[in-house]
């Protein structure tokens, strides 16, 4: 999501908030031999790039109670958690919230019934949202989360997943426009947990919901939420725009389908586009 707030100017006053501004927990559960000591924090990257910004952790990744559930030790921040800084935020300020689940909350033996952010982070986000609408939220996670509230209250959302050793630098470069994002979602982000499992390849059978029968109660639908996900498989934004034209589809003698097209960058920023092709049986 980007409501014309990104990329940010390095001259703009920006507050980076959230426990992941000072955390090195950017590796995934499968990086058995990964060394967290080799991971730079977002705060360190901002200093290295000489970008003036205030960094506030605000809370821990997990509460004490959540640490017991997920069988991890509390990683107490060495930075003060004085909430007076919240009172200094005005409607004109821009806050980049870097939030997400703990690395122990995804991967093997980490099933979850609720896909919201950890409790303390939800509270922190709501307090910030009370002060300003200019919020960019970067989500660190190893699975699709319930991000509806985050999306409603943020002008931009970046799904960073668990970005690895150089993740902090990539996040900072994207936020300030030093690189142009081109990634597309490899999963669907659900509108709420009640939609799970949700997939773009689901075969819809009888009583299919269409534009023509949207008022018909007796269709394959949810009555209280949309059928569509919050962000669908293959979705992703860029700081530029692309035009895909001259699409040609041929079936070769080898019985393979060959697709050709022209891709033109029609914007003012260099970038890359992922051309996606979908087919279905009729």
PLM regions and their residue ranges:
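Extended, hydrophobic alpha-helical segments in both membrane/secreted and soluble proteins
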Residues: 121-125, 135, 157, 171
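An anion/phosphate-binding loop that grips the pyrophosphate of nucleotide cofactors and donors
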Residues: 92
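Charged, often glycine-rich, active-site loop that binds/positions anionic groups
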Residues: 64-80
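Secreted, periplasmic, or luminal enzymes acting at the cell surface/secretory milieu
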Residues: 1-43, 47-49, 56, 62-69, ...
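Glycine/threonine-rich flexible loop motifs
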Residues: 25-28, 99-119
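Alpha-helical scaffolding segments of alpha/beta enzyme cores, especially the outer helices
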Residues: 41, 84-87, 120-130, 244
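A short helix->loop->beta-strand "cap" motif at the edges of active sites that frequently abuts
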Residues: 51, 130-135, 153-155
């Amino acid at each position: 999501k980007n409501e014309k707030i990104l990329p940010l100017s390095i001259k703009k006053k920006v507050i980076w908030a959230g426990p992941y501004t000072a955390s090195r927990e950017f590796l995934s559960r499968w990086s058995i031999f990964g060394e967290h000591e080799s991971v730079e924090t977002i705060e360190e990257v901002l200093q290295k790039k000489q970008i003036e910004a205030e960094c506030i952790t605000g809370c821990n990744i997990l509460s004490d109670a959540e640490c017991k559930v997920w069988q991890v030790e509390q990683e107490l921040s060495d930075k003060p958690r004085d909430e007076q800084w919240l009172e200094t935020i005005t409607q004109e300020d821009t806050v980049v919230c870097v939030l997400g689940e703990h690395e122990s909350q995804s991967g093997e033996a980490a099933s979850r019934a609720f896909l919201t952010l950890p409790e303390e982070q939800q509270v922190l986000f709501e307090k910030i949202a009370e002060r300003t609408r200019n919020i960019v939220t970067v989500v660190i996670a190893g699975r699709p989360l319930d991000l509806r509230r985050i999306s409603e209250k943020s002008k931009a959302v970046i799904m960073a997943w668990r970005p690895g050793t150089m993740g902090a630098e990539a996040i900072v470069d994207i936020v300030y426009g030093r690189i142009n994002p081109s990634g597309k979602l490899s999963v669907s982000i659900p509108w709420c947990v009640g939609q799970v499992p949700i997939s773009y390849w689901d075969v819809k059978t009888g009583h299919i919901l269409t534009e023509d029968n949207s008022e018909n109660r007796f269709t394959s639908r949810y009555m209280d939420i949309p059928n569509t996900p919050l962000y669908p498989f293959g979705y992703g934004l860029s700081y530029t725009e692309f035009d895909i034209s001259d699409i040609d589809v041929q079936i070769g003698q080898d019985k393979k389908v060959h697709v050709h097209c022209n891709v033109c960058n029609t914007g003012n920023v260099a970038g890359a586009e992922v051309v996606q092709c979908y087919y279905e049986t009729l």
